Amino acid sequence: PDLLENKFIVRKGDVIKSYILEKNDLNQKSINLKIKSLLKETSDEIKLKGSQVNEINTRGNFIKKITDFIQDNQNIKFKLEVVSLRDSKIVEPILVEINILKLEI
């Protein structure tokens, strides 16, 4: 087998993937589907960068945080960001959290 350079796949604070939530996305089912999709896209992205890890790990109860945030801020556009919580090389676990940001209209 070929030896792979043990390069960094992601750095702490890197936004790996993001998505803008529109008004029609602001329901629990749509949010859950988008989060699952974002995590799948994140996994695909890190594999494209050369990661040998089969899954990404998440930290925190971000689904509740996102749902609560949206309920308190109706009729606003939001951006979900999948952010790396640590530097990770090819064979190291990828640890992420999903942040939600208000977008100015």
Model-based region annotation:
Residues 1-105:
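Membrane-proximal structural modules of membrane-associated proteins and complexes
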